[in-house]
């Protein structure tokens, strides 16, 4: 696992964009994308570049259950605002959090992933070690599934909503096995609230109680960290 220490998120975005361009040069067809604050600087680099993404596919990690794609806090809306409105892809896939049959929606998303093998997956990490919305205890062999969000995740996401009570309590997320199937992974971590999770991910045992620890078993992971996130290493 390669570690790159950066001064801030802006520098992290630039470093990640160079790695992304290397993947494109090597023939990448499908990008795995993430939401949250960590990848925004990368998306800004993509938007400001002259790189054409219109022949590429994208798949996103997750989506809240119960938020329409038009809701300003849905991950559909996030991706449109941060990237897709300016840099459209040939086709962009996100889980359907409004589906009447959520289990079928999860299975349908597995079918998408089977047809679009991820060449480069972007990840953040939760303070509890989650990747995607795969909370502690998620089986390592999990595929796309419906998730009950933990209190810590709901609390962390409440800053984006008018009140904690408006935060969705469920999501559809790519599973850990789905993430591990990506050929290459870039994980961002910024700030002291991520320091414990980064330490456990890298130095602790590989355990389902720290979902990100499974990345120790992946052949091609690059961590982009600031000093605060790397403080306990």
Curated annotation (Swiss-Prot):
Pfam families: Glucosamine_iso
PROSITE patterns: GLC_GALNAC_ISOMERASE
MF annotations from Gene Ontology: glucosamine-6-phosphate deaminase activity; identical protein binding
GO cellular component assignments: cytoplasm
Domain of life: Bacteria
Gene Ontology BP terms: carbohydrate metabolic process; glucosamine catabolic process; N-acetylglucosamine catabolic process; N-acetylneuraminate catabolic process
Alphabetical UniProt keywords: Carbohydrate metabolism, Hydrolase
Database matches in Gene3D superfamilies: 3.40.50.1360
Active site: 62 (proton acceptor), 128 (for ring-opening step), 130 (proton acceptor), 135 (for ring-opening step)
Pathway it works in: Amino-sugar metabolism; N-acetylneuraminate degradation; D-fructose 6-phosphate from N-acetylneuraminate: step 5/5
The reaction(s) this protein catalyses: alpha-D-glucosamine 6-phosphate + H2O = beta-D-fructose 6-phosphate + NH4(+)
EC code(s) of this entry: 3.5.99.6
Family indicated by similarity: Belongs to the glucosamine/galactosamine-6-phosphate isomerase family. NagB subfamily.
Purpose of the protein: Catalyzes the reversible isomerization-deamination of glucosamine 6-phosphate (GlcN6P) to form fructose 6-phosphate (Fru6P) and ammonium ion.
Protein name (database record): Glucosamine-6-phosphate deaminase
Species this chain originates from: Streptococcus thermophilus (strain ATCC BAA-491 / LMD-9)
Gene name as annotated: nagB
């Amino acid at each position: 696992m390669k570690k790159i220490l950066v001064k801030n998120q802006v520098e992290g975005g630039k470093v990640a964009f160079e790695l992304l361009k290397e993947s494109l040069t090597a023939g990448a067809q499908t990008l795995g994308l993430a939401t949250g604050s960590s990848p925004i600087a990368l998306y800004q680099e993509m938007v400001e570049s002259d790189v054409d993404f219109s022949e590429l596919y994208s798949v996103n990690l997750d989506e809240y259950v119960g938020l329409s794609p038009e809701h300003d806090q849905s991950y559909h809306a996030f991706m449109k605002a941060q990237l897709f409105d300016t840099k459209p892809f040939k086709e962009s896939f996100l889980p359907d959090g409004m589906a009447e049959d959520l289990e079928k929606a999860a299975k349908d998303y597995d079918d998408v992933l089977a047809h679009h093998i991820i060449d480069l997956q972007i990840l953040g990490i939760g303070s509890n070690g989650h990747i995607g919305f795969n909370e502690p205890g998620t089986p390592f062999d999990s595929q796309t599934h419906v998730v009950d969000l933990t209190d810590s995740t709901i609390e962390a996401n409440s800053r984006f909503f008018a009140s904690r009570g408006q935060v969705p309590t469920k999501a559809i997320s790519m599973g850990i096995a789905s993430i591990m199937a990506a050929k290459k992974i870039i994980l961002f971590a910024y700030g002291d609230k991520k320091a414990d999770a980064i330490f456990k991910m890298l130095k602790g045992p590989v355990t389902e109680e720290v979902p990100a620890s499974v990345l120790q078993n992946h052949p091609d992971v690059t961590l982009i960290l600031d000093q605060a996130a790397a403080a306990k290493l």
